[in-house]
Amino acid sequence: MDIGVCVASHINDIDYVVRAEELGYSHAWMADSQMLWSDCYATLALVADKTSRINIGTGVAVSGTRPAPVNAAGIATINALAPGRTFFGVGSGNTARRVMGLPPQRIAEFEQYLQTLVPLLAGNEAELRYDDKSIPIKHIMPDKGFVNLSDPIPLYVSGFGPKSLGLAGKYGDGAVLGITDPQAISGARHMLNEGARSVEKDLESPSNFYTTALTTMVVLDDGEAIDSDRVKAECGAMAMAAVHYSYDQFRNFGHQPPNALSGIWEDYTNLLESYPADRRHQRIHAGHNCWVVEEEEKFLTPEVLNASSMIGTRDQIIERLSDLTDAGLDQVMILPNFDTRFDVLERVAADIIQNV
């Protein structure tokens, strides 16, 4: 099992990835959300310059904010700086679009995007859809050092439901998941396989398809409660980001929240609905995956914390990682609270990476 880090892209926080490389983390995924963080490609360029071994890429770039040729050129530029260790993660825009009051791309649009993107990443000609036209495009100076399209850039497609997971299996070299339950991983593998079979791909070999799950980890001290102040300080932001996502699903589609949120749901929705409707999309993601805003701290119940993060003793987490490996997961990437990120980085490296 590989352990990677997902990073809220911060142009002045490159040392965090440098330290992750020193500690043996396998991948650094730079998050892409233009109304929250620094630009992911600018951050990746600095990361590429300061590191030499860790795999680096977008975690994940957003199809609905940058046209496929722009994203392809961006990651191919990073590949020129870090050949052989650059990857490209892409999704339809859960937070990056919703924070602007827009929905993620629809599945049909996302598939069309991937159809353009895949050949571009390989240095080939692609078809760009514009209005009702299909236009052939390609990078016309790929051999002059501007980009690197010679060294492969693995494509990892983010998927949550059956259709997006099917697209990941069909077009991707791997998938980015938001689940860390072994049974759910097995179910996701089935959906990935369905997509792969539609184009006669074989996902059975790990070398053919690489799966990653986003979460964070807290290694408990002896006798420590799952909702201790330290636990909240290390994974509370991840927990609330999951609540933000559930609220968006409820708000946009009428989906009911998971059972873990039942104890807070009424109070949480009342809080958000006290904000003006025309700017509520700005408030939903306050502190997103970095901090917990003060008025949301009361929602960090044991159930909410445990639903989105891997919290347990060293042995419990190692056993869970073993179960996830058996279910077909290749990597867990962690995204801890911003203020405690170095503490988590060191603890997970010492207690987990050294033992898996």
Which stretches of residues belong to each language-model region?
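Hydrophobic faces of well-ordered beta-strands that scaffold small-molecule active sites
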Residues: I3-V7, A28-M30, N55-G59, T86-V90, ...
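Short, acidic/polar
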Residues: S9-A20, G74, G159-L167, T313-D323
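Alpha-helix-loop-beta-strand connector modules within alpha/beta enzyme cores
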Residues: Y41-T58, Y113, L120, S198, ...
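N-terminal beta1-alpha1-beta2 module of alpha/beta enzyme domains
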Residues: M1-G59, I153
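Glycine-rich, proline-tolerant flexible connector loops at the mouths of alpha/beta enzymes
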Residues: H27-K50, V62-S63, N94-R97, I179-P182, ...
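Active-site mouth loops of central-metabolism enzymes
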Residues: M1-I11, A61-P69, L149-F160, M217-L220, ...
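An alpha-helical appendage that flanks or caps ligand/catalytic pockets
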Residues: P103-G145, H190-D323
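Conserved, mostly hydrophobic/aromatic
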Residues: G24, V47, I78, L117, ...
